[in-house]
Amino acid sequence: MMSHSFVQISDCHIDNVEYAMGVNTHVNLKKIINKIINIDTDALLISGDLTHNGTITSYKTLQQILFPVQIKLLVISGNHDIDNNLNTIFSKNLFSQFTLRKWEIISTNSVQTSKTSGFLTKNELKKLNFNLTQSIAKYILIVLHHPIVPMNSTWDDSLSLENPKALFNVLDKYPKIQAILFGHAHQAAEFSRLGVKIISCPSTALQFNNETRIGFNHYTLYDNGQLTIDTQWI
């Protein structure tokens, strides 16, 4: 059966200096990239917090670390990112929709200025609804930065999306949606709601639970609507 695949990484926290949050985020991301370039995959998606402080220098450093990646690069903003600077360096990679055969990945922006938690504005929900209405894909994946369900872990859920009900009010109208992906919580987890997979991507920097490794998610999308997730660790 025909399939396509893509890799999701998240929360790279690349800074002007190599160390952020007590770990060498530069070296850690390089290890992850070295593993990804040996995978036969169609795209690399970064689901926010590309950098730690959103400086132009850190985005340029990230660009250098990502240089070996020869596949399509897709990025969305996280609460640590500064959109003007992100846009300056990664304008070609910021996306709202991306098609892989019968599948489409649609992003929505949950970032609030100067706040750690997420919120989807009326405008953002309207845009998401419009993109869903327009989609001719058979199957859809949604990606945003913030968690949309309680993480059932040491993670502080008050730092997640503040208005998940408003999001579900939009998404529940579209049975084509197979999964919702996010980062922010620095941990790998999988949930399910009304038959839709809800997937948290680990961080390339460090995890906030007792997992000491760094990791990423590799998704395979089949033409019959099946989706498999392979979380890989280093």
Curated annotation (Swiss-Prot):
UniProt organism field: Ruthia magnifica subsp. Calyptogena magnifica
Binding sites annotated in the UniProt record for AMP: H13, D49, N79, H80, H186
UniProt: Fe cation 2 binding residues: D49, N79, H145, H184
List of residues binding Fe cation 1: D11, H13, D49, H186
Domain of life of the organism encoding this protein: Bacteria
Entry's cofactor comment: Binds 2 Fe(2+) ions per subunit.
EC number: 3.1.4.-
Annotated S-S bridges: none
GO molecular function, one term: metal ion binding
Enzyme superclass (EC): hydrolase
Assigned keywords, A-Z: Hydrolase, Iron, Metal-binding, Nucleotide-binding
Organism taxonomic ancestry: Bacteria, Pseudomonadati, Pseudomonadota, Gammaproteobacteria, Candidatus Pseudothioglobaceae
Listed name of the protein: Probable cyclic nucleotide phosphodiesterase Rmag_0669
Cofactor(s) listed: Fe(2+)
Database matches in Pfam families: Metallophos (PF00149)
Similarity-based family: Belongs to the cyclic nucleotide phosphodiesterase class-III family.
